[in-house]
């Protein structure tokens, strides 16, 4: 059985349990599939190569089991960064960065890869070929939980521009209108109010004040520059 990899021109021999058994990589030319790669792909890469490329890192986001991202993708990134791989490298096909991929895939998102990348210096305002930033991608997800809200907060705290437009002319706030998550709306409204130093459209209640504190959003003009 051969498993195709979406981002790299290669296939890996695997057994019936979807595990790579042979230390061999088979090159091929046609590639355009969403089939997930084998369970032990990251271990295979760490043990078989000393040089990590951006393409290998993009591959890592397709690992089948969620815990593998947390346990093995981070060491892969650490090794790559030690080799001066640019944390803001973009996929040549779609323009997405590692941060874009980390907020798109629920399995990676739940293993705190977005926070890890932001702490390492990932730029939250890089746009892919559709003009979407990681915040656009996150807001357009079909499912929202407290984790997604937390990651949205992180993106904003690390400088995500809530009014940056994609190629359709939509800002993350306008994308929210399609997503319709109430908590996300509250977060974006609070951030915009801080940025504009205009709270006239907000009904400041006890709950709103708690959210200011929880999200560490300052209402003082001198701190609005951080947004």
Swiss-Prot record:
Transmembrane annotation, as ranges: none
The record ties this protein, via SUPFAM superfamilies, to: Ankyrin repeat
UniProt KW Transcription regulation keyword: no
Query: Which controlled-vocabulary keywords does the entry list?
Result: ANK repeat, Repeat
Instruction: Name the InterPro entries on file.
Output: Ankyrin_rpt, Ankyrin_rpt-contain_sf
- KW Repeat (keyword) present: yes
Superkingdom of the organism of origin: Bacteria
Q: Where are the ANK repeats?
A: 94-126, 130-164, 168-199
Q: Which Gene3D superfamilies match?
A: Ankyrin repeat-containing domain
Q: Which residues form a coiled coil?
A: none
Name the PANTHER family for this protein.
ANKYRIN REPEAT DOMAIN-CONTAINING PROTEIN 54 (PTHR24197:SF44), ANKYRIN REPEAT DOMAIN-CONTAINING PROTEIN 61 (PTHR24197)
Protein name, per record: Putative ankyrin repeat protein RF_0314
* Organism of derivation: Rickettsia felis (strain ATCC VR-1525 / URRWXCal2)
